[in-house]
């Protein structure tokens, strides 16, 4: 993949491709995730078998106590469309919201403007600028199916998490719906919104079992949500 820059064709690496994809889709991103209009609802019903991202987001966030007061990493924060109210309410916590896309991050910053316990940081999940075992909770909603280096992302989110604490998230898994898999492989991946390879349920369970001692994992269509204890 390449773009024209100053009259010259410049090759894009995968990370840049992803950032450009999200910048070009900024006006529809929240609508699709939250089913904000009739076209989004039809898209979810047709290609995702009605799986409701709003419901999954609430299930993910329900793993986090309302009185949580530790260090929390949210990666990728995206536009914070699902997490805004929960993070704002956790006033005694220290929350780092990280995203590779500056465009997504700018939208998240607007939502968290004035809240000193929340910081928005541009960064790469495969190379987190954080100390080992520095987080009490790591949250990753709709991130791992987009990360270019999934192995490093799993390693880094594990590295920064304290022993006995929780890794919480949701992501797309392949093998549950031919229609969804076709959409992901032929449309979403080519747009740069998703990045192969993708795990099956069994492959994801095996990855998590190698890294975490307790796993609470649930399937909803082609999406999985989980809470793991290190």
Which sequence ranges carry the predicted segments?
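Conserved class I S-adenosyl-L-methionine
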Residues: 6-66, 81-85, 104, 111
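A short glycine-rich, Lys/Arg-flanked "PGG" loop and its adjoining helix->strand segment in the class I
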Residues: 151-163
């Amino acid at each position: 993949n390449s773009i024209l820059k100053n009259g010259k064709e410049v090759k894009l690496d995968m990370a840049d491709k992803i950032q450009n994809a999200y910048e070009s889709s900024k006006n529809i991103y929240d609508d699709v995730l939250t089913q904000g209009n009739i076209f989004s609802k039809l898209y979810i019903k047709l290609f995702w078998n009605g799986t409701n991202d709003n419901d999954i987001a609430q299930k993910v966030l329900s793993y986090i106590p309302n009185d949580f007061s530790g260090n929390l990493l949210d990666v990728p924060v995206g536009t914070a469309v699902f997490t805004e109210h929960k993070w704002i309410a956790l006033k005694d916590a220290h929350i780092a919201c990280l995203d590779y896309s500056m465009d997504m991050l700018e939208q998240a910053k607007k939502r968290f403007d004035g809240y000193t316990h929340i910081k928005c940081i541009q960064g790469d999940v495969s190379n987190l600028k954080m100390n080992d075992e520095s987080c009490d909770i790591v949250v990753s909603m709709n991130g791992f199916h987009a990360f270019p280096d999934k192995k490093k992302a799993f390693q880094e989110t594990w590295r920064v998490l304290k022993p006995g604490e929780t890794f919480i998230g949701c992501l797309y898994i392949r093998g549950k719906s031919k229609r969804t898999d076709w959409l992901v492989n032929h449309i979403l991946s080519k747009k740069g919104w998703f990045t192969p390879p993708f795990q099956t349920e069994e492959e994801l369970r095996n990855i998590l079992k190698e890294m975490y001692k307790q796993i609470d994992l649930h399937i909803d269509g082609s999406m999985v949500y989980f809470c793991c204890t290190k």
